[in-house]
Amino acid sequence: MNERYAKCIPFDKNVKGRIGGNPPKCIEGQIPSDYKFYATLVHPEKENIMLSIIIHQDYDTLIDNNKYPSIAVKIVEHEFSEIGNCVEKRNANLRMCSISEYSEDKDSENILVKIGGAPSLIQDEESYYKELEEHGFSFFLSIDEDGYSEDVTIGSYPFGYGALYLYKRCTTNEI
């Protein structure tokens, strides 16, 4: 897969991908009680499919469970769905912003999403990816909090001004 990139842009109801706000209507009932909606992205490999990301609501739990196989992040694949009304599953630290369409153009410093290629690791420590690779996973995409626009966060950065790396199983394409 060619490397592609997306940026954090002001909210636009005509753009499918976004960070923050209420979860998509179709996944509201799938979010565990101790998780909050983070983002929904257009699946880079599947037409008309979205990837919604939900994260543990407790920062310490999220950070303490940040390596495979103990991860406090869940991915839900689904068809596009309108923004739901489930305010209690909204992450209060995030304002709603859109995620631009994917492009092969990397001329910006403010890259939010990177798809394919090699991950740009913040901490290049084998312990973060070695077990994933040993179990047949390869890098799929990353979301780097350095790519947030100025007005995305209200309080704390969900990943402590870090990044989220998603890997997929090579044999099944499970993320």
What do the PLM-derived regions correspond to, one by one?
Residues 1-175:
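Preference for intrinsically disordered or flexible, low-complexity segments
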